[in-house]
Amino acid sequence: MSATKYIFVTGGVTSSLGKGIVAASLAKLLQARGFSVTIQKFDPYLNIDPGTLNPYEHGECYVTDDGAETDLDLGHYERFLGTPTSQGNNITTGRIYNTVITKERQGAFLGKTVQVVPHITDEIKRNIQLLGESGKYDIVITEIGGCVGDIESLPFLEAVRQFRWEMGPTDTLVIHLTLVPYLNAAKELKTKPTQHSVKLLSETGIHPDILVCRTEHPLPAELRKKVALFCNVNINSVIESIDAETIYDVPLLMKKEKLDERVLSKLKLSSKNEPDLESWKVFLGKLKNPLSEVNIALVGKYVELPDAYKSISEAFIHAGAMNECKVKIRWISSEQLQKDNLQHHLGFADGILVAPGFGERGLEGKIAAVEFARENNIPFFGICLGMQCAVIEFARNVLGLKDANSTEMNKDTANPVINMMESQKNVTMKGGTMRLGAYPCELTKGSKAHAIYGKSKIMERHRHRYEFNNKYLKQYEKEGMLATGINPETKLVEIVELRDHPFFIGSQFHPELKSTVENPHPIFVKFVKAANDFAKGKK
C-alpha cells in the first residue's frame, strides 16, 4: 500500500468552473482534519512556464519561494492552506516535453523511438509522484488543467489512467467537476452536459469516483439520482457546488455536502478529527460584516482583466477582514491618467495602489498617480514597478531631475534612477531569468516599514530585472525618501518610504504573494488601516 494517497481533479463542459477552488477547498477540509496535504497543477500548454505569457492571455503569474513562475491557481492553494508551494507544484506540457527531449539528446532512451506513450506519460507519472515521494504529505491533489475532450489534455489523462491502474483503487481517486446549467426558458436544470462530459472522460479509461456539479440553483434529490444513474456513480457521490457569495465560502459548502467524508471513505482513510474551521469562520464573519468601507484606486495597465492582479485583490480581502473594513477596488487604467484629469479619476480614493508591470505603456500615468498621492497625503502603496514609479516621480518633482527615468523605458536617460541589475546585463533569454523567488531584507529600526512588520528581518518574493540606483541614494534620503528595507548581501533597495507622509510605501518585492486567509500580509493590513483613517478624516 502507498504511504501517500493521490486525488485527481478533472473538469468538463467548459473552462473556468473553478477546479482550483474546489481542489483548494477539499485540501483545506482535509488539512483541517489533521492530514498533511499539497496540491499541484498540470497545465496542458507548451510554454515551459507562464513567465513569458501576456497577462491578458493567462492572468497573473504567481511566483513561489523557490522562484518558480507558475499558474495563478497556486496562489489559491497557498491562500487556502497557508503553506508554500514550489516548482514541483506546477507542471506544464512544455516542461514535460523539454525534459523528455533533453533525455533523448543525452542518449537516455538507448536508441528507442521516443513516443507519447510510454515516454511522455511516464514523465507525467514521475512528476505526479515527486511530491508524494518527498515523504511530507499524506495526500497529494493534482488538478488537470483544461477540459476533458481537449487534445492538449489527452497525455495527462492517459497518464492518470495508467497511474490509477498501477496504484490500485484505494490509493487514487478522481473527482470530475462539471456544469449543470439552468435553462431559463425551460425553467429547469439540465443534466445532459454532465452526462456527455462523464462519457468523454470514460472514453479515456477513467471513471470518476465523485462528481462535483457547478450550479446556480440547488440540485433536487431526483436530479441527483438521475445524474448518479446515468453517470454510474453513487448517489452520495454527486456533490452540489452552488454559486457562492465569495470563494472563501466554498470550503464550508463542500463540508456541508460531505465531500471530505466521501473522499476519506473511498480512500479507506480513517478521519483523524472533525475539520477545525473556527478561524476560517471568524475570517468569514469579519469579511461579511464590515464596520466601515474604503475606496482603493488600483492603477495598472491590465485592469480590463482583474485576474492579472489576482493576488493583490485577494490580499485586500484578507486585509479588509482583519480591519473589519470592506475594500472596494476601483480599477484605473494608467493610460487614461494625465496631470489635468487626476482629480476626476483619483479624487474618490482613500488609498492609491500602483500595480506591478513591465514596459513603457501606461508608465507616465502611473507616475502621475504617485504625484497625486504624494501631494495630497493620500495613503500610497507601490509594488515592484509601482515602487520604481514612486522613485522616478520623486526624482523629477522633488530632486529636480526632470529627465529621471528607468533604463527599462529609456536606455539613454541622463539620470537612470532605476537601472538594470548587474546580474541581468548579460542575460539574453527571457524565460525564467529574472530575479525570482524569496530573498532576505533587513528593515531600518524606527522606520515605518519596521513598525509595519514588527521585526528587523523579513523574507519576501521577487520578480524583476531592474533596481533602485544606489548612486542617487544620498540625494533621496536628504530630501525625505528613505530606503528602509535593504538586501543584506547585495544592498539592493527593497523598500522606500516617505518621511513626511502619513503612509507612503514602495516595495520592490511582491507582498501580495504571501498574504493568506489566516495570515494577511502586514503591509496590506496597515495600508487598509491608513486608507480607513484617511476616509474618516474626509468626513
Curated annotation (Swiss-Prot):
Task: Give the multimer and partner information.
Answer: Homotetramer.
List, alphabetically, the SUPFAM superfamilies matched.
Class I glutamine amidotransferase-like, P-loop containing nucleoside triphosphate hydrolases
Q: Which pathway is this protein engaged in? A: Pyrimidine metabolism; CTP biosynthesis via de novo pathway; CTP from UDP: step 2/2
Write the record's keywords in alphabetical order, separated by commas.
Answer: ATP-binding, Glutamine amidotransferase, Ligase, Magnesium, Metal-binding, Nucleotide-binding, Pyrimidine biosynthesis
Name this polypeptide is given: CTP synthase
Residues annotated to bind UTP: 15, 190-195, 226
Extract the PANTHER family matched here.
CTP SYNTHASE (PTHR11550), CTP SYNTHASE-RELATED (PTHR11550:SF0)
Q: Which residues bind ATP?
A: 16-21, 73
Query: Catalytic activity annotated for this protein?
Result: UTP + L-glutamine + ATP + H2O = CTP + L-glutamate + ADP + phosphate + 2 H(+); L-glutamine + H2O = L-glutamate + NH4(+); UTP + NH4(+) + ATP = CTP + ADP + phosphate + 2 H(+)
Recite the other comments: CTPSs have evolved a hybrid strategy for distinguishing between UTP and CTP. The overlapping regions of the product feedback inhibitory and substrate sites recognize a common feature in both compounds, the triphosphate moiety. To differentiate isosteric substrate and product pyrimidine rings, an additional pocket far from the expected kinase/ligase catalytic site, specifically recognizes the cytosine and ribose portions of the product inhibitor.
Name the catalytic site residues: 384 (nucleophile), 510, 512
Tell me the residue numbers annotated for binding L-glutamine. 56, 357, 385-388, 408, 465
Concerning Pfam families, the annotation shows: CTP_synth_N, GATase
